[in-house]
């Protein structure tokens, strides 16, 4: 969150100019399967599970394994260090010894996961919520504070535990929260069964996402896979849990220790929750699948009128699971914002095709109110030397639609924001269109023709001035008597229509960017905008749209 405040969870400010690429360190090398070295942009940065905040016109990324980076333009990044990255044992050694450390996982260095940072106005401090991970889900989220967002950091204490049972319960704050007293026979005297079941409430205390709601209250979501995503209230005076708030035990809704359930559960994948507010809606982002290159990691979107939910997708499917959904990364719940795409606007090479995109944060910059999605991605055919995978942090602009959803821009943000069309003539023309299929993902397997499963390639459509959408080459009218086509001459097959929107739709005011697209019997609400292509920087008209719970992208060819 920005120090200068805003109505969103993490508001931001923008600044012109950029960190000089020469300050970002040398360009790194990655290798494709054919042995060709791929030189990465020196302004790029690899921060896993990136959380973004802003202070005084500078953007900061914080990620897993204490990686930090900063930028003045969200394009050119440089790494930086602080006392947490240099010597984590000095800050976290005691809590590591007290809870997560086990013989099966003895090193703290690989177990500092997914921090998030927020400005606490009451404390006058930056608060970092960091996961200290252990085997068997014996993890703890801790609080660190700093006067400046780049550090140095001071350890405050634990916020929430996971992986407890009767043998170690008294080493946590669970008895305090549940108001338990030790029994004379050594038993707990409380049914902990639900905390031992991965299909119930046995979660991993990782992936903290602090949030400041519109009423000024601080909350924190957390959790990973298994038992779902939960949220409880924080005390703004301490930054720790608000122990005065009690939560009832209600199946699939609330838990006395973990608070309010907002998503997932029943062993269904789902982690990396994040929230942002826009036009009276709270939007929940979370990642389905597994984070590896072939794991199908992907961002799904839900919304609610309340920070605490209930969250649903466009088709009304709840974010909370009420039963097992095997391979839910291949199912239709949640709007999939991005996928693996290869088209002529870029990326053109498989070494640059994004796969396994996820664990995002989001930010609103105070300069103009524009929102941005920040996430990490792996690549179809890019591997670090000595490692089987390579990853980067990427940024895309988030665009609100006229029916109250958010879509991601078709091209990565490289300094140029989305520019609205000035009229119909800007929109008409040929488009390459890709669909972010919820039911498939890049898994490393190849078809008989050598193309990868799960990499989406475009279909060519033409948007006509009269509102028709056609596809393909000219077809003889007499060869298609059963096509029910609105034409009486030879020509391309009409497969849809489009029209600009004006006035108000579902309570939202439309602008020149808003349009309705009817394509293959699905109605999409679209945002048209000029953006530079990734492959060459050429400005082209694009659109991002949502319909029937599915996102599509289009780019003029």
Model-based region annotation:
Residues 1-557:
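Carbohydrate-active catalytic/glycan-binding domains of CAZyme proteins
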């Amino acid at each position: 969150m920005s120090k200068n405040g805003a109505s969103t969870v993490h508001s931001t400010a923008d600044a012109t100019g950029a960190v000089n690429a020469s300050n970002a360190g040398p360009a790194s090398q990655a290798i494709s399967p054919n042995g060709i070295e791929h030189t990465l942009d020196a302004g790029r940065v690899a921060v896993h599970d990136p959380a973004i905040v802003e202070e005084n016109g500078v953007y900061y990324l914080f990620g897993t394994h204490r990686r930090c980076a900063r930028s003045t333009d969200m394009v050119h990044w440089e790494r930086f260090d602080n006392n947490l990255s240099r010597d984590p044992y000095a800050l976290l050694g005691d809590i590591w010894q007290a809870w997560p450390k086990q013989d099966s996982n003895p090193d703290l260095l690989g177990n500092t996961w997914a921090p998030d940072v927020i400005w606490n106005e009451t404390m006058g401090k930056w608060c970092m919520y960091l996961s200290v991970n252990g085997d068997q889900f014996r993890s703890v989220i801790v609080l660190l504070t700093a006067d400046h967002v780049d550090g140095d950091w001071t350890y405050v204490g634990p916020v929430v535990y996971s992986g407890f049972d009767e043998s170690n319960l008294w080493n946590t704050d669970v008895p305090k929260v549940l108001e338990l007293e030790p029994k004379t026979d050594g038993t707990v005297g409380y049914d902990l069964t639900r905390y031992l079941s991965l299909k119930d409430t046995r979660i991993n205390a990782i992936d903290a996402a602090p949030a400041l709601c519109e009423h000024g209250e601080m909350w924190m979501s957390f959790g990973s896979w298994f038992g779902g995503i939960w949220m409880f209230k924080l005390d703004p005076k301490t930054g720790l849990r608000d122990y005065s708030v009690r939560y009832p035990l209600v199946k699939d809704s609330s838990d006395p220790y973990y608070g309010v359930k907002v998503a997932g559960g029943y062993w269904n994948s789902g982690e990396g929750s994040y929230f942002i507010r826009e036009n009276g809606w709270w939007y929940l982002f979370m990642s389905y699948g597994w984070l590896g290159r072939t794991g199908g990691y992907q961002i799904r979107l839900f919304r609610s009128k309340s920070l605490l939910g209930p969250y649903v997708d466009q088709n009304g499917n709840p974010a909370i699971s009420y039963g097992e959904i095997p391979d839910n990364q291949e199912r239709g719940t949640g709007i999939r914002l991005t996928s693996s795409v290869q088209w002529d606007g870029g990326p053109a090479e498989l070494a640059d095709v994004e796969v396994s995109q996820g664990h995002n944060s989001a930010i609103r910059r105070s300069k103009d109110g524009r929102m941005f999605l920040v996430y990490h991605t792996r690549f179809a055919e890019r591997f670090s030397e000595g490692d089987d995978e390579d990853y980067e942090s990427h940024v895309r602009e988030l665009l609100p639609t006229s029916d109250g959803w958010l879509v991601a821009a078709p091209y990565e943000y490289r300094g140029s924001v989305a520019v609205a069309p000035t009229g119909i003539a800007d929109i008409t023309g040929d488009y390459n269109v890709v669909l972010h299929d919820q039911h498939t993902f890049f898994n490393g397997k190849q078809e008989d023709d050598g193309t990868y499963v799960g990499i989406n390639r475009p279909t060519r459509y033409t948007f006509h001035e009269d509102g028709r959408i056609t596809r393909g080459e000219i077809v003889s009218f007499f060869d298609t008597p059963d096509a029910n086509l609105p034409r009486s001459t030879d020509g391309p097959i009409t497969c849809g229509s489009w029209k600009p929107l004006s006035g108000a739709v579902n309570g939202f005011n439309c602008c020149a960017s808003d349009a309705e697209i009817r394509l293959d019997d699905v109605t999409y609400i679209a945002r048209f905008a000029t953006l530079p292509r990734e492959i060459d920087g050429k400005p082209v008209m694009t659109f991002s749209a949502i319909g029937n719970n599915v996102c599509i992208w289009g780019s003029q060819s």
